[in-house]
Amino acid sequence: MTPKKGKKRVKKNIAAGIVHIASTFNNTQITITDVTGNVIAWSSAGARGFKGSRKSTPFAAQVAAGDAAAKAMEHGLKTVSVVVKGPGAGRESALRALSAAGLKITLIRDVTPIPHNGCRPPKRRRV
């Protein structure tokens, strides 16, 4: 068999970065970038092996955040500012997992889009 060809991950030496947490009702995605916006590491609940309704749990968000933080710390990341977006269940647990992984959080910003009476919302579920 031929050896697997692909890009080798280049070790960057980055001290500060931005963590983008996108938390929807169905999944939680964590993207870690440098201050200019170039992606260093990313993870999501689905990428960590959770399927279906388990992706939307706080534990899945915690696992995804820990994984993304570990990947980013390989590049020398130490301090981060956090940008949280969305109404999902994994917002707070992802933040706790980032600080537990050893990243120093300097700023937390909530950029959840709020409509000023925009589109009509989806109808209520009747179970």
From Swiss-Prot:
Coiled coil: none
Keyword Cell inner membrane attached: no
Protein's UniProt keywords contain DNA-binding: no
Gene Ontology MF terms: rRNA binding; structural constituent of ribosome
Superkingdom assignment: Bacteria
Record keywords, A-Z: Ribonucleoprotein, Ribosomal protein, RNA-binding, rRNA-binding
Protein's GO biological process: translation
GO cellular component, one term: ribonucleoprotein complex
Family: Belongs to the universal ribosomal protein uS11 family.
PANTHER family from the UniProt entry: 40S RIBOSOMAL PROTEIN S14/30S RIBOSOMAL PROTEIN S11
Subunit details: Part of the 30S ribosomal subunit. Interacts with proteins S7 and S18. Binds to IF-3.
Protein role: Located on the platform of the 30S subunit, it bridges several disparate RNA helices of the 16S rRNA. Forms part of the Shine-Dalgarno cleft in the 70S ribosome.
Protein name (record): Small ribosomal subunit protein uS11
Biological source species: Anaeromyxobacter dehalogenans (strain 2CP-C)
UniProt gene name: rpsK
